[in-house]
Amino acid sequence: RHIYRNQRTGMGRFVTFWVTELPLLMASTRKQLAIAAGIFLIAVVIGGLSARYDTDFTRLIMGDGYVDMTLENIKEGKPMAVYGSSPMVDMFFGITFNNIMVSFYAFAMGLLLSYGTWLILLQNGIMLGAFQYFLYDQGVLHESLRGIWLHGTIEISCIVIAGSAGLVMGNSILFPGTYTRLASFRRGALKGVKIVLGLVPCF
């Protein structure tokens, strides 16, 4: 009976987290989410403009190998073949692991008083903007929009949401309010961890 009661309690806690606690937490941190999304979108614009006015910028950001491979795929009429160039299982785990790591860094870098999270969001936004403009410049905008956003909408959203979790944690150190700095950090870190846990089904 004791084991059964514990199982029911655990299941109830699980349901409460997903149905009540997480939605309320996301609502209470919508300001940080808006800031994270704003940083990312500004970075996308910066990346696109930089690629427009500096033809070598995309190579600087993405690397010569990636750009050359994409150009070769475009010549072959398969501009988005980069997402299918690996065996399906390897590609899946490679993409998933990379998204998890970027999202984790976006959150963990909040320990650097939120500035680390800003850096991760800026870096990834600039990469996306530069690569998107590069594909536009090559005349494959339509294919790139389908390929990148069909493949990456959830992943990009996860990075932004994880970034908001990093801002929640970092801001708790910068702005403790009526709490001690340590107590505020603990509260902020716990909120951030819960937000990141909410992303697990998306990976």
Predicted regions located by residue number:
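Short, non-transmembrane cytosolic segments of multipass membrane proteins
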Residues: 1-5, 60-68, 154
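Soluble N-terminal domains of membrane-associated systems
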Residues: 1-15
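Cytosolic juxtamembrane amphipathic/interface segments immediately preceding
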Residues: 15-30, 81-82, 90, 182-187
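Alpha-helical transmembrane segments and their helix-start/interface "positive-inside/aromatic belt" motifs
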Residues: 24-42
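Small-polar-interrupted transmembrane alpha-helices in polytopic inner-membrane proteins
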Residues: 43-47, 117-137
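Interfacial/capping segments of alpha-helical transmembrane domains
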Residues: 49-73, 123
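Individual transmembrane alpha-helix segments
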Residues: 84-116
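Hydrophobic alpha-helical transmembrane segments and adjacent short intramembrane/lumenal linkers
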Residues: 129-201
